[in-house]
Swiss-Prot record:
Catalytic activity: homogentisate + O2 = 4-maleylacetoacetate + H(+)
UniProtKB keywords: Acetylation, Dioxygenase, Iron, Metal-binding, Oxidoreductase, Phenylalanine catabolism, Tyrosine catabolism
Cited function: Catalyzes the conversion of homogentisate to maleylacetoacetate.
InterPro entries reported in the protein's UniProt record: HgmA_C, HgmA_N, Homogentis_dOase, RmlC-like_jellyroll, RmlC_Cupin_sf
Designated name of the protein: Homogentisate 1,2-dioxygenase
A single Gene Ontology CC term: cytoplasm
Species name: Pongo abelii
Amino acid sequence: MAQLKYISGFGNECSSEDPRCPGSLPEGQNNPQVCPYNLYAEQLSGSAFTCPRSTNKRSWLYRIPPSVSHKPFESIDEGHVTHNWDEVDPDPNQLRWKPFEIPKVSQKKVDLVSGLHTLCGAGDIKSNNGLAIHIFLCNTSMENRCFYNSDGDFLIVPQKGNLLIYTEFGKMLVQPNEICVIQRGMRFSIDVFEETRGYILEVYGVHFELPDLGPIGANGLANPRDFLIPVAWYEDRQVPGGYTVIDKYQGKLFAAKQGVSPFNVVAWHGNYTPYKYNLKNFMVINSVAFDHADPSIFTVLTAKSVRPGVAIADFVIFPPRWGVADKTFRPPYYHRNCMSEFMGLIRGHYEAKQGGFLPGGGSLHSTMTPHGPDADCFEKASKAKLAPERIADGTMAFMFESSLSLAVTKWGLKASRCLDENYHKCWEPLKSHFTPNFRNPAEPN
């Protein structure tokens, strides 16, 4: 595969032309009477026209035929995609899933859309407020099929297998330890090269942003220059049997046929684009004196709610770093949280739980449900020599954190057959160390 090219930056005003058609972007205006190369001008809006400039999202696409040229949409089977948060009764228990099983290609060919499974979520699509967490399990590429999401943005986290993603803006190669965001309404198709697995965070009605840095300053965490946007690429391809365009609309799937590939955008400009990011570029902030800092310091992207400082969803990672805090229990502390915490593992192990939490699996600690290090981790960390040490080398755990109370789907609790019924047992060996007559040796007599 030839090396793909990208544009660097987050949320930038960008422009790109396929080099096969120089001068394909109109000069000085968006929709001339006749576009260069006799292309059609089409605007893709990601925000209301009247949003402030700082939040206004739109791009202009110059394409061979316009997107409107298709047959009517018809409802199709949703498979395991759902936005019904009342399928099963609520469950406040700590939940952990073993690695989700990828179907064997010898048994059945499954592409990313067919292999999409909703695990949990909350909120309402029709009012543009909420989120869903999906697992994708696939073994074959999307052939003459593309997908777009009318309901929200997808943040895609591949765990196993590379994704070659065709979009209307160009192509992206996304590998494990990278993420990508495909925003609302953007059509895409994904090629895979092996049995493939990953996680998707979907948010309704908002877009992902870089978190505010506050006293950290102008630089740090995920730096804008490390986000990559594809460059224009098109194919002028007729599809005699029809190309299938799949739309997720109000939580249901619909399909329409058209005669050509939708990836026919010769040039584009704007600030509403797909993008990718390599997690190795995250600049870690950590405590260098004492105590365990709150995990918000590891936020890569946030989707803000209307309440200041409160997110519909945060994407947080736990990257390789130095641990140097003195007089401190260094693993994550025991916690009860007003937020919901879903965790996944791309590779390696998670520092607070060496066993049971495996790559390709997940865990959900719901609102106010207690969680924290397992018994083995507590005993070791309480007695460890506090020398500077590397933490999480060779690993990458992540968290989708939300202010919403997440409901688990029927597939998540039952049909996936991956729920670990023994998860609670990792805390059972925790014992009391209470010493009523304890005296701190540092205190004077």
